[in-house]
């Protein structure tokens, strides 16, 4: 029986899969574990009553497991690992924090209006550290196999690449060869393409935050 999962609909296009990296993380987990699922698209700008009844906080993703609705991508991924242990996506503890500061650094730089506030350099250092990690331990975060760390990181890298190029005319430095190889491998993969929002929806999704900062 397919699991039901509520995910973000594209801004301005309620019938199209949206751009939430946390939703994509869960969808990628389901894809990697080959767990059948059906998606319910939620317009976060006009949340339907049925959605607020199952999750009063109004956040996505939310997934129905054993007749219970579960929120929060960290919690969901943990439950999926317990319920569907094969293939294992457990990240070895020594690699669990790889890239954990990347997304906050990206958001600070993206929304910054001061070119001298250090946010660009902070993001550069995070990307550099990830590139060096992949050089030493790749091709994936934990070596030769895909783990939960990859499935959390890759959707965020997708947003970083699209949003910064559009809003800041900023690209991930070409010198980060291992990082570029990593994203190229993932972004062209069938499961990633199936579960990612379109480029224009990523841009629309960030526009409000950028313009209001």
Regions found by a protein language model. Name each.
Residues 117, 165-174:
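Acidic, serine/threonine/proline-rich low-complexity intrinsically disordered regions
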Residues 144-166, 178, 186:
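GST superfamily/GST-like fold recognition
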Residues 127-131, 161, 187:
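Structural signal for well-ordered, non-membrane alpha-helices
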Residues 120-123, 172, 179:
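Hydrophobic packing residues in well-ordered alpha-helices of helical domains and bundles
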Residues 174-200:
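A contiguous, mid-protein "functional segment" used to position or interact
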Residues 200-213:
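C-terminal helix/juxtamembrane-tail motif
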Residues 1-141, 145:
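GST-like domain detector, emphasizing the conserved glutathione-binding G-site
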Residues 40-46, 194-202:
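Acidic carboxylate-rich catalytic motifs and surrounding loops in phosphoryl-/glycosyl-chemistry enzymes
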């Amino acid at each position: 029986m397919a699991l039901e999962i509520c995910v973000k609909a594209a801004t301005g296009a309620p019938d199209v899969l949206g751009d939430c990296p946390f939703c994509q993380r869960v969808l990628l987990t389901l894809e990697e574990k080959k767990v059948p699922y059906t998606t319910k698209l939620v317009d976060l700008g006009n949340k339907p009553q049925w959605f607020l009844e199952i999750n009063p906080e109004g956040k996505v993703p939310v997934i129905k497991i054993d007749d219970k609705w579960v929120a929060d991508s960290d919690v969901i991924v943990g439950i999926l690992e317990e319920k569907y242990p094969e293939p294992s996506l457990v990240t070895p503890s020594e690699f669990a924090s790889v890239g954990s500061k990347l997304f906050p650094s990206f958001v600070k730089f993206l929304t910054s209006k001061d070119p001298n506030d250090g946010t660009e350099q902070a993001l550069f250092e995070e990307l550099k550290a990830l590139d060096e990690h992949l050089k030493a331990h790749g091709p994936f975060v934990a070596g030769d196999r895909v783990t939960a760390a990859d499935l959390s990181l890759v959707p965020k890298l997708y947003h970083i690449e699209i949003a910064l190029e559009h809003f800041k005319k900023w690209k991930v430095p070409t010198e980060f060869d291992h990082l570029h190889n990593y994203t190229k491998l993932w972004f062209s993969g069938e499961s990633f393409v199936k579960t990612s929002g379109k480029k224009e929806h990523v841009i629309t999704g960030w526009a409000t935050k950028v313009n209001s900062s």
